[in-house]
């Protein structure tokens, strides 16, 4: 895919005046090497062509979460500044398994698992990256070149690093000291990731702070092949909702990119106080000067901002109203635990008493009417008073929370056969 033509600044001083360059090189950045943020800013300001900016993601799990969004947003910033984002799906390296941060070897995935995960990754990355503007994005798979390496080429690649250099990687060093097995295929991983930069002729590579070693290997291999070595930009690892561990689905401290607005809002409005500013910095473009002084209002703004970002402003407003409505008698209902009821193939108008019966919240339509008359039924937290209440169309029901008494809830979802 050829990059679109574009006029770039020619003076280094423009780096100081271009807010896009400042955002790329400073906001939400842990480290830039070599030369720091100033060196990358100068390169961005003086380049006469779009830079090729690489981000590799191994599809080891089926879904993305906000931890992945941090580096994807950084890649989007390069896109918005006119550069070429390369989203590299590590379909080959996922079969090897990245040893970074692992106290033991990763379980091996099957090609079918990797392919299915890759499919969902691409769908979800579209919530952040620009997939529409011609020339702004290349989606590549490293099996394109890694699967074709011959044995002699692989030996030559391995000859570029020593065992001592590999053991300088902290994860390997800890396992070596503790006597935990290190398998030979794991030593290959940094070399394969580095070779990706050679194959793509990357100018910049992005990654989390835990990827520093692998990014540096990419620079060394580019030098070996006579290429100009890439800049490396790392972003912080996002702490999860527990407040201290890295966000991870396995730790159940995550917010998924595809979670519904109400669940996403309800999780985010409870982000620990000490992490709210960090979430704003890494996941939004809201300036620090615009953050409310009140800690609770900061949490609410964070939740609304991110729901709007991944869904819509309307969805964020509705999620806030519903979440507030679910604060009943001082007890917050955990919205993530509310079951859903799929309303399928109903003819409209439909009575609320029918839905109460079909959802199982009431045993019969007669009981449903009695519960309504007794003031026990609420819709999005608002008491329902009319036992004959009807809904004319599906949109009046979809996504709303129906409640009977203090503990019986369901979220209504309009489905189809």
Curated annotation (Swiss-Prot):
Cellular component aspect of the GO annotation: cytosol
Residues covered by the S4 RNA-binding domain: 350-414
Localization: Cytoplasm
Location of the motif 'KMSKS' region: 246-250
Molecular-function GO term, any one: tyrosine-tRNA ligase activity
Source species, domain of life: Bacteria
GO biological process, alphabetically ordered: tyrosyl-tRNA aminoacylation
Entry protein name: Tyrosine--tRNA ligase
Gene behind this protein: tyrS
